């Protein structure tokens, strides 16, 4: 079994432990990883960093948490080194001055260096277009805050993404869509930051880091689109409940003077009883005031 397959196997076992909430044997797997020479290529292709990070968040074992943090910290250095090389290459790229053969060869080599694919699963690292540099203080500050949001919980280490570059992409897309740095622009950036940092919605941040959601998409998504699956389900249930209440109030019912409207204080009401939960629980009573149209319910 090759090194990549072995690391991928460990990652799968860690994922199962997280799913089952049973970390028995996790320390042995983490020690195996500690003794393995991990490269940035292996980190990106196996996504083992995300598995270790998920285990760290779930565990209450201090020794396990410490070892997981140590691994993530050591892997982060690989990403920092890679980012440093990329920045140095960007600074060292010669400006076009002459048509000499040596300069042409140097340019050709610098263009060819990024070509070898790091992994098929992470093309975004090499295919993102270059972002224009801005001297606008507001835009630069927004890029910094977006970078910090993307770095929440260190998921970027596991994926192997340059957060500074990605945040610049997102900010550039927002700026191009809005056209200036007015309040609309600031509110747009602020909502991206809030949702990317949301501890209850880590899926959004991971999808952005992995490229499943592109910078162009996250730049224009609505709050509803960025919401977590759990919040979407709650909103869906509330919408269904509101529709049902409205329909119940309009489909007949029994007229009574037993209820007093808390809005107009009249007793001219119509009520409907519906079994909305299990059969052994009380029915839900929907009441509508025939005088002012006020609606309420109780169990």
From Swiss-Prot:
Signal sequence region: none
Cross-link (Glycyl lysine isopeptide (Lys-Gly) (interchain with G-Cter in ubiquitin)): 57
Compositional bias annotation for Basic and acidic residues: 102-116
Cellular component, GO annotation: centrosome; ciliary basal body; nucleoplasm
Swiss-Prot/TrEMBL keywords: DNA-binding, Isopeptide bond, Metal-binding, Nucleus, Phosphoprotein, Transcription, Transcription regulation, Ubl conjugation, Zinc, Zinc-finger
Tissue expression per record: Testis and ovary specific. Specific to testicular germ cells.
GO annotation (BP), single: transcription elongation by RNA polymerase II
Binding site for Zn(2+): 261, 264, 289, 292
Superkingdom of origin: Eukaryota
Predominant location: nucleus
InterPro entries according to UniProt: TF_IIS-typ (IPR035100), TFIIS/CRSP70_N_sub (IPR003617), TFIIS/LEDGF_dom_sf (IPR035441), TFIIS_cen_dom (IPR003618), TFIIS_cen_dom_sf (IPR036575), TFIIS_N (IPR017923), TFSII (IPR006289), Znf_TFIIS (IPR001222)
Phosphoserine modifications at: 59, 100
Compartments in which it is found: Nucleus
Residues annotated as domain TFIIS central: 138-254
Protein family membership: Belongs to the TFS-II family.
Subunit structure and binding partners: Interacts with the basal transcription factor GTF2B. Interacts with REXO1.
The protein, known as: Transcription elongation factor A protein 2
Source organism of the structure: Mus musculus
């Amino acid at each position: 079994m090759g090194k990549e397959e072995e690391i991928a196997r460990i990652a799968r076992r860690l994922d199962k432990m997280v799913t089952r909430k049973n970390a028995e044997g996790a320390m042995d797997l983490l020690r195996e990883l500690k003794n393995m020479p991990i490269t940035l290529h292996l980190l990106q292709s196996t996504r083992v960093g995300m598995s270790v990070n998920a285990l760290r968040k779930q565990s209450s074992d201090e020794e396990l948490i410490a070892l997981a943090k140590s691994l993530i910290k050591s892997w982060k250095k690989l990403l920092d080194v890679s980012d440093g090389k990329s920045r140095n290459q960007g600074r060292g790229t010669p400006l076009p001055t002459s048509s000499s053969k040596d300069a042409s060869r140097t340019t050709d080599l610098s263009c060819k260096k990024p070509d070898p694919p790091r992994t098929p699963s992470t093309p975004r690292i090499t295919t993102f277009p270059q972002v224009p540099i801005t001297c606008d203080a507001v835009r630069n500050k927004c890029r910094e805050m977006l970078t910090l949001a993307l770095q929440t919980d260190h998921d970027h280490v596991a994926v192997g993404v340059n957060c500074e570059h990605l945040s610049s992409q997102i900010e550039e897309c927002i700026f191009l869509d809005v056209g200036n740095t007015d309040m609309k622009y600031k509110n747009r950036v602020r909502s991206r930051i809030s949702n990317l940092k949301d501890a209850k919605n880590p899926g959004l941040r991971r999808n952005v880091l992995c490229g499943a959601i592109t910078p162009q998409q996250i730049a224009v998504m609505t709050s509803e689109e960025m919401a977590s699956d759990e919040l979407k389900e709650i909103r869906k249930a509330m919408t269904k409940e509101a529709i049902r209440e409205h329909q119940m109030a309009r489909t007949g019912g029994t007229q009574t003077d037993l209820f007093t409207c808390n809005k107009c204080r009249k007793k001219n009401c119509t009520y409907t009883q519906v079994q909305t939960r299990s059969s052994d629980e009380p029915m839900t009573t929907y009441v509508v005031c025939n005088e002012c149209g006020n609606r309420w319910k109780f169990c």
